[in-house]
Regions:
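Bacterial N-terminal signal peptides
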Residues: 6-18
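N-terminal leader/linker segments that initiate helical-solenoid repeat arrays
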Residues: 21-60
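Alpha-helical solenoid scaffolds that mediate protein-protein interactions
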Residues: 42, 58, 65, 87, ...
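Residue-level recognition of tetratricopeptide repeat
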Residues: 72, 116-118
Length: 150
């Protein structure tokens, strides 16, 4: 399961990082982008065993972004991506709480703007539902995954 979550994080990262963040002022965009950039640097340049403390700090920053920009779907998407990365680092059953939190953030983002970050929320949710085990362990469901990815 640890490897699957790492792959999931990579796919989410690939789909979302190259997307433009929109509908925010340039200064707001820069603040959200800085957190996203810190996450990208951590994810790609540090060994996995060194990522967790930084990801936890980024998670707190993402929570602050949500408080500062409660209507910005992009802040929720970044928070969801960070939670996915933390889940990949934790692995096993302890990661399930993180992926549920990630799903919650992404669903909130999609309620605000389903096309934020070029519709990355659909890709994130599709991957979460596809990669995770189904009931009774988690919420994985291939049919739901397909509905988000199509």
């Amino acid at each position: 399961m640890r490897l699957s979550l790492k792959i999931l994080s990579f796919l989410i990262l690939f789909s979302a990082l190259n997307s433009a963040v929109g509908a925010l002022s340039p200064s707001d965009l820069k603040i959200i982008q800085e957190v996203k950039d810190e996450w990208e640097t951590t994810f790609y340049t540090l060994p996995q065993d060194q990522q967790e403390p930084i990801l936890k700090t980024l998670s707190m920053k993402a929570d602050t972004l949500i408080q500062q920009y409660p209507d910005a779907a992009e802040a929720y998407l970044v928070a969801g991506l960070i939670q996915c990365s933390l889940a990949a680092n934790e692995g096993g059953f302890s990661a399930l709480g993180r992926v549920k939190k990630a799903r919650q953030f992404v669903l909130q983002a999609m309620d605000k703007n389903p096309l934020a970050m070029d519709g990355s929320g659909y890709v994130i949710l599709g991957n979460l539902y596809y990669r995770l085990p189904g009931w009774p362990i988690s919420f994985g469901d291939n049919k739901v995954a397909r509905s988000y990815l199509e």
